[in-house]
Amino acid sequence: MLKVIEYDGNLKEIAQKLNNRKEEISIEVNNAVNDIINDIRKNGNQALINYCRKFDGYQIKDENDFVVSNQEKEEALKQVDQDYIRILERTKQQITEFHKNQIDKSWSLYKDNGVIMGQMVRPIERVALYVPGGTAAYPSTVLMNAIPAKLAGVKDLVIITPVKADGKVNPVIVAAAKVSGVDTIYKFGGAQGVAAIANGTETIEKVDKIVGPGNIFVATAKKLSYGVVDIDMVAGPSEVLVIADENANPKYIAADLMSQAEHDKLASAMLVTTSKELAEKVNVELKRQMAYLSRKEIIEESLQNYGGAILVKDLKEAFEVSNYLAPEHLEVLVEKPVNTLPYIKNAGSIFLGEYSPEPLGDYMSGTNHVLPTGGTAKFYSALGVYDFVKYSSYSYYPKDVLETFKDDVQTFAKSEGLDAHANSIAVRFEEE
């Protein structure tokens, strides 16, 4: 179970181990994805059709089969239970309530001398949301990405998702798209899907940004497409860090640690506590609860390789550990947890108290579950409305005000060897 480690002020080894969990992008994968991107750029629709047939087994006839038709949507929605639709709608309300507070506004500054300056906030025009295919469906991914984009004002939001050989998109993905207000769903994914939507083809309009999770080929395609389009982030394996005092409930802690460990064998679940007795009780609970969970083997390997219980002398040290590791998810199970917020510097998303478990955040708390991993919470943020807008500054200067700056600007420009810059100012004050 969790290996108990006494904190001695040195976390470099632990941090390095956690941050190295990302799958290395091998030369082979990189080259393969590069070839796919170049093929799509050169051969467009036909290359995409070939890859759909090769990788997904979807015997697509022509480019008309790229998009989920209205009839296909109607048939898919009939397969989704109405109570599930209710849950999606409730989740949408929660996400909207939180994220609407992130909406930024344009502003202007009018000075007495006639100068006008300001900043315009404008939505990104066209965005693609990648939704993983396969046996598992992730409608929460649709909601978490689409709703902030819609609140930002993105008018053209599309989904790309791989399909099986039958060419069908999972019905719950169709339902989530409808609830989120996404009308266009493309039936392709993988590196080829990213390449097609990033570069465009004869019938597919290129986007300005791609968001959403995917496998190593999707992640590589997104990285290689950055600059042609914007991307959200390239996330690594999931992680949770729980800070707990001696009064925390070991049953809850064990359950929350396993909720992350079940994602995959590279997931990390760490406990930081002031109580060795609590750590021991958590290990007992892990064994007990794990016995009846379907992903027991994955959980066990994850906890063994990337789990641990770090013993600290006080909560000050606990937050020192947490801020250094900068976890994707941080749970704080101590007395008066809300009062600890000033001590938290680096965390993707924070869950305060015993009744705010991380899985609530995965689905329905309203906060976003697209989060920085691998220590990148030190400089990255959770996905939000701000990821779907751009900022343009503007300025208006009357001639008489420019004249008060002309000598200084020319001197500055010449000091950098940019005579044409200086000339641009000078010509405006030459006598005709």
What would you call each of these model-derived segments?
Residues 324-432:
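C-terminal core of ALDH-fold dehydrogenases
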Residues 109-175:
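Conserved small-residue-rich beta-alpha loop and adjacent elements
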Residues 2-9, 184-189, 309-314:
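Short acidic-hydrophobic, aromatic-tinged amphipathic segments that line or gate anion-handling sites
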Residues 213, 233-244, 260-283, 299-310, ...:
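Short loop-to-beta-strand entry elements in the cores of soluble alpha/beta enzymes
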Residues 155-164, 269-275, 353:
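Short internal beta-strands
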Residues 1-125:
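N-terminal Rossmann-like NAD(P)+-binding subdomain of aldehyde/semialdehyde dehydrogenases
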Residues 181-252, 256-259, 263-268:
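Conserved NAD(P)+-binding/catalytic subdomain of aldehyde/semialdehyde dehydrogenases
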